[in-house]
Amino acid sequence: MSAGDDQIKAVDVRWMDRPGRIAGWRIRDNLIDCGPTTTLPHLLHALDGWRPKRLILTHIHFDHAGAAGALTREWPELEVYVHRRGARHLASPERLEASARRVFGDEFDARFGGLVPIPEERLHPLDGGETIDGLRIADTPGHASHHICMLDESGWAFVGDVAGVRLDPGEPVFAPTPPPDIDIDQWLASVALVAEWRPTRLGITHYGVVEDPEPHLAAIAEDLRREAKLIRSGIGTDDYVSVMTDMLGGGGARERAADYAMTVPLGQNYAGLQRWLERHGADSQV
């Protein structure tokens, strides 16, 4: 274990009442990501009275940042740090929530719950290049234009969704590619940036600690290229879902594939890739 590891803890918010789906990260006086509003009781229970000074959000997707506004009501002293491109949506979340409700329909409330506005005076926009309590901030677009990653002085990197989804060690690593602003070229550059840091461990939201970052980062880069090749082939939604289900379930473990598909709905993955192809495919180097 490296210096400072004893101050770093994954916080399981038990999304959809199941463990091992969404992790926040407790590090010194900071909470990195907080999960959706629906998991707020689990988050507070897991924190067991501990109160951070700062909430630092890797990006504003609901599974990472949904509870942020509710936490500012719970903890009046809490300051929230987020990419500049996402800050205004947290101050005035009505359009963001309405858009998500159109996508998820009747599932929205069960999956995420509503957003509470964050007072602008408690929002701190980030551009990348800042250092916050030993956490070096980097602008890392690709999964989202408003995504940041953090390299801690301990050697840990907290990477949100840039390093993809891998629910348990030894399982496949794959890229969550929901609409609207997937950019595979930018994403690969962000993965390369994190790899250049040579982190000792990764803290990923879905899910937990990656003890050996180098092969994991290579695996997410490989999956991004595979996804680009798939969508360029003209594959349809149903065939894409079938291919990914086989990959995630190891060709037979359908229940495990379903766990991944609940965490990242495969139909939305397809829609995000299709949008990327239409917007960036002609200019992409992938």
What spans do the regions from the language model cover?
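C-terminal regulatory/interaction regions
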Residues: 230-286
